[in-house]
Swiss-Prot record:
<keyword id="KW-0274">FAD</keyword>
<dbReference type="Pfam" id="PF01756">
    <property type="entry name" value="ACOX"/>
</dbReference>
<keyword id="KW-0276">Fatty acid metabolism</keyword>
<dbReference type="InterPro" id="IPR002655">
    <property type="entry name" value="Acyl-CoA_oxidase_C"/>
</dbReference>
<dbReference type="Pfam" id="PF02770">
    <property type="entry name" value="Acyl-CoA_dh_M"/>
</dbReference>
<dbReference type="InterPro" id="IPR012258">
    <property type="entry name" value="Acyl-CoA_oxidase"/>
</dbReference>
<dbReference type="GO" id="GO:0033540">
    <property type="term" value="P:fatty acid beta-oxidation using acyl-CoA oxidase"/>
</dbReference>
<dbReference type="InterPro" id="IPR037069">
    <property type="entry name" value="AcylCoA_DH/ox_N_sf"/>
</dbReference>
<dbReference type="Pfam" id="PF14749">
    <property type="entry name" value="Acyl-CoA_ox_N"/>
</dbReference>
<comment type="subunit">
    <text>Homooctamer.</text>
</comment>
<dbReference type="GO" id="GO:0050660">
    <property type="term" value="F:flavin adenine dinucleotide binding"/>
</dbReference>
<dbReference type="InterPro" id="IPR009100">
    <property type="entry name" value="AcylCoA_DH/oxidase_NM_dom_sf"/>
</dbReference>
<dbReference type="GO" id="GO:0005782">
    <property type="term" value="C:peroxisomal matrix"/>
</dbReference>
<keyword id="KW-0560">Oxidoreductase</keyword>
<dbReference type="InterPro" id="IPR055060">
    <property type="entry name" value="ACOX_C_alpha1"/>
</dbReference>
<protein>
    <recommendedName>
        <fullName>Acyl-coenzyme A oxidase</fullName>
        <ecNumber>1.3.3.6</ecNumber>
    </recommendedName>
</protein>
<dbReference type="InterPro" id="IPR046373">
    <property type="entry name" value="Acyl-CoA_Oxase/DH_mid-dom_sf"/>
</dbReference>
């Protein structure tokens, strides 16, 4: 039995709003300038605000706290409605980019018989919609994934591996790019293999007689697993399978395989599909398993930009491949996901940092002595140490996320152009750029998704018991986030892969003087032969006096760490023996990338920050981030003699502790600078007005309504009554009342 509140809602004992309002009034930070910095440019900031405004005011796309109470099937139904809603925005967004608002049918144009008239959709065409999807994913990650699997994985797999004709057919004529006609999934992972793509077991056997491929699942472990959209939604799959021609295995290639009839959604012959069931989070995604039993597809359904099965008039068959790009092209679809996860890290980090900081400012606990007001959480030094470095994380992620995204799109454009070029030099150049992009995206994806997983849980704990409530977002936020640490590349495997490439670059530079001054000059500038020599000789000293030192210290540490690893590998002849250290290389490389990109941007005109007080606050964020992670990794910094124990305790830690109260003074200005409306936060303890307790209580009551008279017993009420009924006999003997005899016993 429950009963409505009888407390006057206007009575106020604790008033967290006054603290938020005071902090906001006292802040000297220019919020508009900082937000422009965080959104990369004034134009992007304007677009972000316009799209957020549309999203939070769309009755279908917006989310409220009832989102946290939804069950699996409810989530999937709601997600399906939202997918349909997003699809309706897509054509509008493309026309906006093209400035093409005349009364024409974009789908009809894309399907035109004459390829010259059917203008292909480019990355630029999808710029606004991609931005919209990224922002939607911040309030509803499962929706972002559902659409992202179709456009980002299925679509980019076709773009990265298909011929121009195949791209046009699947993405334009069949309507995939506009989410019309067909809906795709990405069938790479198997029950028995995930990260080791080269050992996937699904087979695509070429049938020479019928000029077709036969797709087959040879055993249980080859079952496609975790396939988003497969269980109920996808009509087609981009399937990773072993190409077998005349008995020879050519390795894993990509094929488009129909799964369902798009008009009836009936499974096609030979295709078996099931739902993989309950997951830790993102239940709005219908992840499924797929098995193929002799499924026949035309030869043309093999994506053939870099590997072709060619049938000659005389009946002979040859396999032609472009070795420069064939191997890495197979992973190109995953690049978009990894790049987007770095951007997601900025968006998610800013969301949860905002909630936790506002709560820490408004919440009071314990008075220093009797008669004084209770202290705000944010004024406790330990709380500052727990919260403020986490606030710095999304600040440092933002510049590198936008830079990585821009690099990704420009490199992909070069890839498409190079694969159509007769000039081998173009292929060589874009191949090197892709490899560097793989290193950076792998390192940054792994490191940042780990950082945000830590951020969400640590900040949840700083909000105490209220952080544990689903209505404040941390629980579902964490469950939805941590899949990022294992999908589209397990973080440890990605870290090892990127670090091995960095180690090779280091050895080539240190021992052979090899360094590409064109392609490696940015992310890998610390690997220049001259710089390595200066660090090894001791000419370059570590210190924390100038702003640039907070980045360079990571360059010095990386070189000493890589040199140490090189020595160990030379002795053991086993790269696996240094795996733990290689993961550190990847993390340190990512942290250096983040610091360097932030430093370069804040030092440039492109920072868009003209106010000196604001810029000083931004530099404090930069220094606090670097110092926090130096302190976290102080063991390594001492091991490689970057700092002595005395320097850690007398230089690094005092600087770190001194910065906390300085950044604390700006914390509301820094969180306001993310410019996230309440509807994007969806957490009543973090809303802009700071009315923590009323906002939270009202949302709890709205989602758990109570009858005025307290009527309505739970279904298990009889069980509780029966359990307690075991004591009724004694109660009845005493007349069922608290008589004088009982009270006298209690009071003895």
């Amino acid at each position: 039995m429950t009963r409505r509140t009888t407390i006057n809602p206007d009575s106020v004992v604790l008033n967290p709003q006054k603290f938020i309002q005071k902090e906001r009034a006292d802040s000297k930070i220019k919020v508009d300038q900082v937000n422009t910095f965080l959104e990369s440019s004034p134009e992007r900031r304007t677009l972000t605000h316009a799209l957020i405004d549309q999203i939070v005011n769309d009755p279908i796309l917006k989310t409220d706290t009832d989102y946290y109470d939804a069950k699996k099937m409810q989530e999937r139904e709601i997600t399906a409605k939202k997918i349909a809603r997003l699809a309706s925005y897509m054509e509008h967004d493309i026309k906006t980019v093209r400035k093409h608002f005349r009364d024409t049918d974009l789908m009809k144009e894309l399907q035109a018989n004459d390829p010259d008239k059917a203008s292909p959709l480019t990355n630029k065409d999808l710029f606004i919609f991609d931005k919209r999807l990224s922002l939607v994913a911040n309030i509803d990650p499962q929706l972002g994934t559902r659409v992202g699997v179709h456009l980002g994985l299925f679509g980019n797999c076709i773009k990265g591996n298909g011929t121009d004709e195949q791209i046009r057919y699947w993405l334009q004529e069949r309507g995939a790019t506009l989410m019309k006609g067909i809906y795709g999934c990405f069938a790479m992972t198997e029950l028995g293999h995930g990260s080791n793509v080269a050992q996937l077991q699904t087979r695509a056997v070429y049938d020479k007689q019928n000029d077709t491929f036969v797709i087959d699942t040879p055993d249980l472990t080859a079952t496609k697993w975790w396939i988003g959209g497969a269980a109920h939604s996808a009509t087609h799959a981009a399937v990773y399978a072993r190409l077998i021609v005349e008995g020879k295995d050519y390795g894993v290639k990509t094929f488009v395989v129909p799964l369902r009839d798009p008009s009836t959604f009936q499974l096609l012959a030979g295709v078996s599909i099931g739902d993989i069931g309950a997951k830790m989070g993102r239940d709005g995604i219908d992840n499924g398993w797929i098995q193929f039993r002799n499924v026949v597809i035309p030869r043309e359904f093999m994506l053939s930009r870099f590997t072709k099965v060619v049938r000659s008039p005389d009946g002979s068959v040859t396999v032609k491949t472009e070795p420069q790009l064939d191997q890495i092209s197979g992973y190109s679809a995953l690049l978009s996901g990894r790049v987007n996860m770095v951007m997601d890290s900025f968006r998610f980090g800013s969301k949860f940092a905002t909630i936790a900081v506002r709560y820490a400012v408004g919440r009071q606990q314990f008075a220093p002595r009797k008669g004084l007001s209770e202290t705000q959480l944010i004024d406790y030094p330990l709380h500052q140490y727990r919260v403020l470095p986490q606030l710095c994380v999304p600040y440092l992620v933002s510049p590198v996320a936008f830079k990585l995204m821009d690099n990704y799109y420009s490199t992909l454009d070069e890839l498409y152009n190079a694969s159509s070029s007769a000039y081998k030099a173009a292929l060589v150049t874009v191949s090197k750029k892709l490899k560097n992009l793989f290193i950076d995206s792998a390192s940054l994806k792994a490191t940042n998704t780990w950082l945000i997983a830590t951020l969400i849980d640590e900040l949840r704990q700083t909000c105490g018991g209220h952080g544990y409530s689903q209505y404040n977002g941390f629980g579902k936020g964490y469950d939805d986030w941590v899949v990022q640490c294992t999908w589209e590349g397990d973080n440890n495997v990605l870290s090892l892969t990127s670090a091995k490439s960095i180690l090779k670059k280091f050895i080539d530079s240190a021992t052979k003087g090899r360094f590409d001054n064109t392609l490696d000059v940015d992310s890998f500038s610390y690997l220049k032969p001259q710089y390595i020599g200066s660090v090894v000789s001791g000419e370059i000293k570590s210190g924390l006096k100038e702003l640039g030192d907070y980045t360079e210290i990571w360059s010095i540490t990386l070189i000493k760490l890589l040199a140490h690893i090189g020595t160990l590998v030379e002795k053991s002849r086993s790269i696996d023996s240094v795996s733990k250290l290689l993961v550190l290389v990847s993390k340190f490389h990512a942290l250096r990338c983040m610091l360097k990109t932030y430093y370069d941007k804040l030092n440039s005109r492109d920072s868009h920050i003209s106010d000196e007080i604001t810029k000083e606050s931004m530099w404090n964020v930069y220094k606090l981030f670097s110092l926090y992670f130096i302190d976290k990794h102080s063991g390594e910094f001492q091991q490689f003699k970057i700092f002595t124990p005395d320097q850690i305790s007398k230089v690094v830690q005092p600087q770190l502790l001194a910065l906390l109260p300085i950044v604390r003074k700006d914390c509301i200005g820094l969180t306001d600078s993310f410019e996230l409306p309440d509807a994007m936060l969806n957490s009543p303890i973090g809303y802009f007005d700071g009315d923590i307790y009323h906002n939270y209580f009202n949302e709890v009551c709205r989602n758990n309504p109570v009858e005025a008279d307290g009527a309505g017993k739970p279904s298990y009420h009889a069980l509780l009554s029966s359990m307690l009924g075991r004591g009724f006999e004694f109660d009845q003997k005493l007349g069922g009342a608290a008589n004088a005899e009982i009270l006298s016993k209690i009071n003895k």
